């Protein structure tokens, strides 16, 4: 729960940076479902701002070096925890992922590029 709460804080911070501020707020973790909802809401707010014509108040480098890279670290932690719980995240070819602005919720379309193990003699990319 703390990881998800922290990731929500990170995307709130990223939005703040994108808007030309740099407000960091460390929230108190809530119940699991509330944190998941808050995470998706934070991600959606950042996604909408980045997709808009509003000017960026921080460089792309600052956003990636700060909150986004921090969040990627925690995504890796969650993947490790899932694998330890025999519920691994399926692999996919991220270069071919169907990424669309506004599609940031828990419900995602099936990805045709997901796999459990790459075909013998072939690489994932």
Label every model-predicted segment:
Residues 51-58, 115-125:
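Long, charge-rich low-complexity segments
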């Amino acid at each position: 729960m703390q990881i998800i709460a922290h990731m929500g804080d990170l995307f709130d911070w990223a939005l703040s940076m994108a808007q030309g501020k740099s407000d960091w707020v460390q929230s108190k973790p809530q119940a699991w479902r509330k944190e998941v909802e808050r995470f998706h809401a934070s991600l959606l707010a950042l996604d909408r701002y980045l997709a808009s014509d509003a000017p960026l108040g921080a460089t792309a480098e600052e956003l990636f070096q700060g909150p986004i890279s921090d969040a990627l670290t925690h995504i890796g932690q969650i993947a490790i925890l899932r694998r330890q719980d025999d519920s691994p995240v399926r692999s996919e070819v991220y270069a071919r992922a169907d990424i669309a602005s506004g599609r940031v919720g828990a419900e995602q379309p099936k990805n045709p590029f997901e796999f459990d193990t790459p075909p013998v003699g072939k690489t994932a990319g």
